[in-house]
Structures are given as structure tokens and as C-alpha cells.
Amino acid sequence: MDVSIPKSQHKTVCRTEYGTLQKVILCKPEHMTIKDVINETQKHFEDDNIHVKTANDQHSRLVEALRSHNVEVVLLPVRDGLPEQVFTRDIGFVIGEKAFLSSMTEPIRQGEEAVIKDFFHSQGISYTRMLDTSIEGGDVIIDDDIVYVGISQRTDISAIGQLEEALPEYTIVPVKLHEKFLHLDCVFNIISESEALIYSQAIEPDAADMLAKRYDLIEVPEDEQFTLGTNVLSIGKKTIISLPGNRHVNQQLSKRGYHIIEIDLSEIIKSGGSFRCCTMPLIRGE
């Protein structure tokens, strides 16, 4: 499938996780707090909670890094009462040239869809609303004509049928996660046509075997899964944004010829998401 589409031709186009990132949605963590614990990472950091100034400083460095690599960054407006807004990946996703509006599971996050819906309307972006199911963008990973969908705490198996109906030209592949793991991108991420990061213990054996036949898998150790070693962000041309503390992951990627941009996102990670979670790509090229 041709991915060499000029930036100006489409308002949304994403066909891989590793094509050159051209336009992406983020949101500042201005109201970030661990209020209602909704994942295992938050349980660990509930007493420490979030230092909002530190989180904002770290987020600003991520935005600066993206812009310095010629990525157009769209910052959504922040709203009171939405402490998880920083994790823009979950509220929507783009597959091919089609945008989708997610259906959020947790009540504390359910106001976030309205913000991205307002943005879509303001930009004249048509979208498909996922109804009568639950699905979040952290469970959606694309690789050309294949879409992997995590079946998790946040995404229900009923979403598969809706995606198949909306995307008949794609193969939709469900990937069952063990219950404690939040999203597919917390344990799996494709970084090239042939390579992917994985924490295989989080994935049902049949699904892990299927992925091993398709990709050269780079195993993430347990301690670096906790700091979301798989949740890197590829910006194209074998350049990846990753956490400095995930040394094993970064060393393995460097050995394979990837350029690593290390940014500290440790304050935001306390709430259960890292670089991929904080970014919703609108346009990727080759």
C-alpha cells in the first residue's frame, strides 16, 4: 500500500506506526492528578501523586523535540475535571485516511471525546464514532493493511466487528491481553516493517506466537515494562523517542541502528502512559 502521500493532500493519513510523523495531537497535563485510580501504575504512585509543574515541564520538552523535528503539534484545549487529558492517544485514532472517535471505558475519561470531536469539527475532519462498544486508541496498532487491536480492560471484543465493517480493506487482528495490563501499546509496539518491541508475558500465548512469526521481537524486561518501555514514539527514519531510564530498550534499539531521543517523562508515567500514549498522530508519511 502506497504511503507516499503529500502532506497537503489529506487531513488525516496514518498507515504505520513508524512512518515520518508530520502532524500530531497533544494536550498539556495542566489538570493532571491521580484522582480515581484506574490502572496498576496509578496504584503504585497514588500516595506520591503528580507534581503538575514537573509534568508540564516534561511535556513541554516533548513538544519542543517534536517541533524541532518538523512535526506540526496541535495542542488541544485543557478542561477542568479531565485529569487524564494528556493521554490523547486514547480518545481517537486514524487508520489509513479514516479518523475514528473512541468510546472511553472509565467515567473519569468520558468527557475527553467531546474535546477531540470539537477539533474534528473545527478542521472539517469527518470521523466514525465507535458506538455500543468500548475501544481506546492505545489498543489500536497499525501496520500497512493489518490493524492489531488489543482486547483489554479498555477495549471490548465487540469493537472488532465495527472496525471490520468500517475498514473492509484491512485485516483486523484481535490480540488478547492479560487482565492487569492497560492497553496493547503498554506491552507491544511496531517500530519498523520487521521489528517490534514486546513484553510477551502480558499477551495470550497464541497471540504472542502469531506476532513472533511476523516480527523480529525485542523483548522488554519486566522492570522496563513497568516504566512503559514499549510505549516509545517513532517519528520516522529510524528515530525513536524513549525514556532515558529504559536502558535495555534503548541499547537494543541503538544496536539495531535506531537514533534514540531521550526525554524524561517520568512524572507523566506515574499515571500510566508514556510517549505513545501522549500523542495522537493525524498524518504520517513514509
Curated annotation (Swiss-Prot):
One of its GO terms (biological process) is arginine deiminase pathway. Keywords: Hydrolase. Its EC number is 3.5.3.-. Disulfide bonds: none annotated. Coiled coil: none annotated. The active site is at H183, C277. CDD domains: amidinotransferase-like. It is an enzyme of class 3 (hydrolase). It comes from the Bacteria. GO terms for molecular function: arginine deiminase activity. Pfam families: DDAH_eukar. Belongs to the DDAH family. This is Uncharacterized protein YkgA.
